[in-house]
Amino acid sequence: MNRWLKILIALIVVIAIGLIAAGLYFYNYAVVPGKKDFINENTPGSKVVQTPEGAWFKDDKNRQEWSITSEDGLRLKAIYLPADKKSNRTVIMAHGYMGSAETMSVFAKMYHDWGYNVLAPDARGHGKSQGDYIGFGWPDRKDYVQWIEKVLTENGQQEQITLYGVSMGAATVMMTSGEKLPDNVKAIVEDCGYST
């Protein structure tokens, strides 16, 4: 084998190893759940802010924990807050990147004040839900179809459902809109999807 061919093969191997290492680094940096040093502390939906709404969300006496098992076997958790007066309207919320149900407290309180039942799930790999990677809405869309089914099972077939998402959660509800949804889903609100 001539010398230049050996150098070329060695160069290709080094470049391939470098690309694989870079890919693994960036996968772990962005997709694996955990503390992210690149997230600005003011990024909407990425941290729990001490507000009156946050205290209400955490301490509401009617707060319930709901759970489902995803199609791929993950245990997913959510916080359910029934409306103060019996209501057949439920909003299902979707938080942003590295957020959790609690980071949606301001929006949860707003919908609750409007007379909605509120369901705030932790996306896979976030909060109390299981998951080894962040799906950026794609696998989560199927989870939200299951959350819709859970609301209908728990609250009845007369329920009118709104999906509301912020940032990555907005991407989630947009992707959910492409699935076969029951007629009970009356509105889908995406707040700043893909802008962050």
Q: What is each model feature region?
A:
Residues I134-N155:
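Alpha/beta-hydrolase active-site loop
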Residues E71-P82:
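A short loop-to-beta-strand scaffold at the N-terminal edge of the catalytic core in hydrolase folds
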Residues K150-E154, E159-T196:
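Primarily recognizes the serine-hydrolase "nucleophile elbow" in alpha/beta-hydrolase
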Residues Y97-M110:
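The serine-hydrolase catalytic nucleophile loop
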Residues M1-I17:
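N-terminal Sec-pathway targeting helices
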Residues A108-Q130:
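Conserved alpha/beta-hydrolase
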Residues V14-T69:
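An N-terminal hydrophobic leader/cap segment in hydrolases
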Residues N88-G96:
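Short beta-strand element of the alpha/beta-hydrolase
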